[in-house]
């Protein structure tokens, strides 16, 4: 690419450097002192030049210019080294070999931390002195701190290897002469064009596209991952390089600008190419400068700094970093558009002249047949194509119809069709948006029984979805700066539709059986699909996105052809789309008022069913690993309790009767025990335990308590893995203590376990039977059981006083660099309206090891009795909810006391010094000496935990 317009004069004074090096060389390069001085001189020139390139990057903002400047700087240093080598160190080697740049360096671009790839071209049968001369150059570069990838070959060897090795072929395609024998480089290029490139275009293109697909698969096959790889990811620099390789190989161009003259790209599309390349290079160069290494993943911990370096500012509803990342993803989308346009051009302009190309690039072939029911489109080898180039101009509705016809016929898209869609987006105006037929077709696509997400994704990538629904266009490529959401908002919405389609087809039974069961009975399927697509459409606005999204839906639904009743249903679903998830994960589902309040918001069984399905789709579409069986269990519990209330089967009387029935069932299950033992152990459990804990767990717990008592254990733990719910259960039996949860939480933090939930129960004889669920870490049960046993042992050691809590937590100093990128102001909400019996305290802040232990320690220090707790993490954010009472069992009603509780909690959440941190309890159970060896798990207990 041409770089003549760039001023390199401030990057390096070449004449001065050469003069200083020459003076040192005359003293003899074989002396260590002179060699060290030369190294220091060249190293300083390189560092100063790169620092100047960084300064100019900040000044002019051009990433491509920065990459050119660093490449030019490297050229000068290598040229100086070559001259010193052939004129002083090995004077007989002048003109014997050639130094050429390959890879990105061969394109005359170099990132600050990138490797330097060199090809040394030799004459056949080079002398040993030639190899020594090359080694001298390489060792100097290595000693300067550069990572140098190199090859030494003759022209003949290059040609021979290029015939069989596509990597070598690509490297030679990008060679650029730096210094030495220029005739060797010219010979290589001439022979390469004649012996390798001629008639091998289809082969090369197929290999490069296959290589691209594999690269995407490894990097994450979506351009909407919120921590993208700028170099290797979809829509990144390597995709642009692939376009350049194909263009250079097939069209014999040295610069992408020549593609405009050939009619492959329009002037506007070439400008898009230039802007995309310059932007991606700016991001990459800033990343390398910031991290001091070849960092290619745009991770959370550097995104904010890169946004600042590129001068992005916050706007209402979007932070500076979110605006920067939205621009990034829009550029990645542009790269995808350019890829499709180039593929279309390869077929349209070259396939007839080169029939061999047709079977290689995406099954290209110049054959087509009619598609029943349409005259606008034809089928071309399993792909939908345009019957005439002016189809869209004649009838803009065909811009929507194209996707509808592709869906009902199960066709892929011809790249030329998508190219023409992209070039016809201006035809999507208000008239088309209000067109009844266009909206009918769109609703049919959205609610298709086939693969609606695939078609919606194609519409989005082609730019149609954002033009047809401008409100959707506002969230295209929008990311949310947090560790919870894995994709951009538009990709999340399309993935949510994909999840709904799976449920609709009956394919979700293993993941969430209840939604699978409910879906066939949903009365308004269309409304549900619309709600799923639109539920986050108002993200990025100042106002609450649920309320704003409901307002957007009220406007869009009639346009889509929905009735007033359907519209109101969609509006309600979007307004409430977070409610069920938050209630299930942050509220005590055994508290009757939780269910009553939720049922008051839902009001009907139909709404309840649809809200559950929408909630499941939303959570599962957030990203891999976010959904798990434990969340599914919470949602099922909330659903069934609410269903019971809405259908009239929920009352205080029924709760008492259900508790009595549960006690009878437990007693019956222990039929092989003596009657005295059965009654004694069943009477240990209060109503909340009997109503909320499944019978099989009650049986396990009761057997566990009996075995512990027989063994004389005051303290015991039992572990069990649960692969379906993706959690591991640790049950702790201990004398009750106000700080028991603090110790358990702290011990878990010290063992590196993430608590997903805590069930706190007391028995009538003054013991605590606490069950904690920790997120599963290992897929294999045996590995997970060993981990759980380690956590259980840690809990026992801290409770027994063998280890101190502050010390063991301090050992968990795992670097949470990513979390440091986020700012979440500590929030404390104390309310008496969510429970009839307890005060509910909800805290929200940035997560860190030991946080739950510190919070519960403060609550205990404030004489608050924790009755139940819900621990929920959303990426880097934690929302913990505690149901508490004072020491006499009353709610916290005094305003001054509530204010003091809030202040203490906010202080510890913010990481400020708190007197409780050093006074965290340890050894709250009687010393082991008074209890024998009961704290250690027996073989029987381990087997019981494993078998369970």
Swiss-Prot record:
One annotated GO biological process: regulation of nitrogen utilization
Region called Uridylyltransferase, residue ranges: 1-372
Catalysis: reaction(s): [protein-PII]-L-tyrosine + UTP = [protein-PII]-uridylyl-L-tyrosine + diphosphate; [protein-PII]-uridylyl-L-tyrosine + H2O = [protein-PII]-L-tyrosine + UMP + H(+)
GO molecular function: [protein-PII] uridylyltransferase activity; phosphoric diester hydrolase activity
Keyword Ribosomal protein: no
Keywords of the record: Hydrolase, Magnesium, Multifunctional enzyme, Nitrogen fixation, Nucleotidyltransferase, Repeat, Transferase
Region: Uridylyl-removing, residue numbers: 373-728
Cofactor(s) recorded in Swiss-Prot or TrEMBL: Mg(2+)
Activation/inhibition comment: Uridylyltransferase (UTase) activity is inhibited by glutamine, while glutamine activates uridylyl-removing (UR) activity.
Domain annotation ACT: ranges: 729-810, 840-921
Domain HD: 489-605
Matches recorded under InterPro entries: ACT-like_dom_sf, ACT_dom, HD/PDEase_dom, HD_domain, NT_sf, PII_UdlTrfase/GS_AdlTrfase, Polymerase_NTP_transf_dom, UTase/UR
Source organism superkingdom: Bacteria
EC number of the protein: 2.7.7.59, 3.1.4.-
Stored NCBIfam families: PRK05092.1, UTase_glnD
Domain statement: Has four distinct domains: an N-terminal nucleotidyltransferase (NT) domain responsible for UTase activity, a central HD domain that encodes UR activity, and two C-terminal ACT domains that seem to have a role in glutamine sensing.
Listed PANTHER family: BIFUNCTIONAL URIDYLYLTRANSFERASE/URIDYLYL-REMOVING ENZYME, BIFUNCTIONAL URIDYLYLTRANSFERASE_URIDYLYL-REMOVING ENZYME
Family membership: Belongs to the GlnD family.
UniProt function note: Modifies, by uridylylation and deuridylylation, the PII regulatory proteins (GlnB and homologs), in response to the nitrogen status of the cell that GlnD senses through the glutamine level. Under low glutamine levels, catalyzes the conversion of the PII proteins and UTP to PII-UMP and PPi, while under higher glutamine levels, GlnD hydrolyzes PII-UMP to PII and UMP (deuridylylation). Thus, controls uridylylation state and activity of the PII proteins, and plays an important role in the regulation of nitrogen fixation and metabolism.
Name used for this protein in its record: Bifunctional uridylyltransferase/uridylyl-removing enzyme
Gene for this chain: glnD
